[in-house]
């Protein structure tokens, strides 16, 4: 009986440690660390769990797509691929600066950008996204869509209490061995379009 009283807590402790070590290697743990890094303004931790270069490139592509499809009459109807080739590299740098600046200071830079793809700047698009998520939508959690081939597809699920509608922001994460890293937001343009009517 005495051996059981000694061994049982050790087994429970070992199981808890094993669970934590496995959980640390799951995509949801990485998302918690991204939130923690954002709140604590910890750029090193943020960059461990978010590939800033890949995310910035993703945001730049989404911004061009959003501008060409929905917003800017000046460039609407033009070849989207030509517009993407012209503006995406510069926008990539702009978004990278914005993301890093936000992590360091907790706000988006007020300085404008020289990129003139639309009357709405990249900063305005991200601030609009933040405003909708913080003030108009309720966060319903993360859902894992698929894990395989070194990638995980997740959704950040939101709903609008005023309209009882749901909205999903799709995230792609890459398996880095001992942790997962966000590399893409794949439907930002559709997400922004879907929440504009709120």
Listing of model-derived features with the role each one plays in the protein:
Residues 4-24:
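Hydrophobic membrane-insertion alpha-helices, especially the h-region
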Residues 18-26, 156, 174:
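Short N-terminal edge-element motif at the start of the domain
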Residues 26-42:
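Alpha-helical transmembrane signal-anchor/signal-peptide segments
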Residues 39-68:
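Short extracytoplasmic
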Residues 57-115:
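Structured domain cores in non-transmembrane regions
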Residues 92-198:
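Exposed beta-sheet edge and beta->alpha loop/turn motif
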